[in-house]
Amino acid sequence: VFELRELSLSIGEPFTSPAWGSNLVFFSGDPGAVIPDENAKEYLRRCCKYARHYEVYLIPERFMVMGYTCMCLITPQGKVIGAQKAVHLYLPTTPGNKRGAALEVMNTEFGGVFLCVDVDIYHPELVRVAAEMGAQYIFCAQQMARSDYSSHMVISGIWNAAQQNNVFGAAVCNQFHCVCAPLSISPYEDGFLAKPTLKTPVTVKMLADDLERCPKRRLLSRKLYAVHRGELLG
């Protein structure tokens, strides 16, 4: 059982010093460039060293492992406590890649964390399942062609995830970074804690207990989920 702490998020360029007071760092980098399989081990070693040095939780850039596109969460002690494989693929850039088949929600002192890889954020049923599993924070790293980017891609992705599931959501992308919250607890009741930008660092404070003030959402039927789990996860 964890006593929930305030999460002080810093979105910034890889391996640069985190914003003062941050306790969780989300690397932006160039999310269009996934760390290749042959470089992943050394990259993660550097990430673990960074987290340990600055005593922060860290969500690195996406990386490849045995054909899967992955994200992971590293503790301030420099240990990987969980990883998530992409369940759905962005086929123009991932031909031949493998698809994951399971979701993992990681328990932290801030609350439940779910890592949403690439286009999984545009599958609301998947994020809903993660929320039912206890996720209070959704972190998404994705890529998209410049010609595909519009405000609709933000609203239908991480913003929608926050509104539909009463969770906090942070996204990094080669076209934008932003942080979202349910309308009722966002400062201007627009669903944003940090509006889309490419400037870094982006710094935001969040507390999972604040989600209790949100209007209650309808729960997903566990019986319905059990019957259709295969379809929900693709």
Language-model features and meaning:
Residues V1-L9, V105-L115, Y137:
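Beta-strand-turn-beta hairpins that frame and shape the catalytic cleft
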Residues R5-A40, Q142:
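Short, conserved active-site loops that position catalytic residues or coordinate cofactors/metal ions
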Residues T16-N23, D37, K49, H53, ...:
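Eukaryotic scaffold repeat domains enriched in small/polar residues
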Residues L24-S28, I59, L115, Y137-F139:
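Structural motif
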Residues N39-I59, P124-V202:
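CN hydrolase (nitrilase-like) catalytic-core segments centered on the catalytic cysteine
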Residues P60-M64:
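Short beta-strand-to-loop element that shapes/binds the nucleotide-sugar donor at the catalytic cleft/hinge
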Residues M66-M133, Y149-G157, L193, L211-G234:
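Active-site catalytic loop in hydrolytic enzyme cores
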Residues M71, L103-V105, V179, P201-M206:
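Conserved hydrophobic/aromatic beta-strand scaffold that supports enzyme active sites
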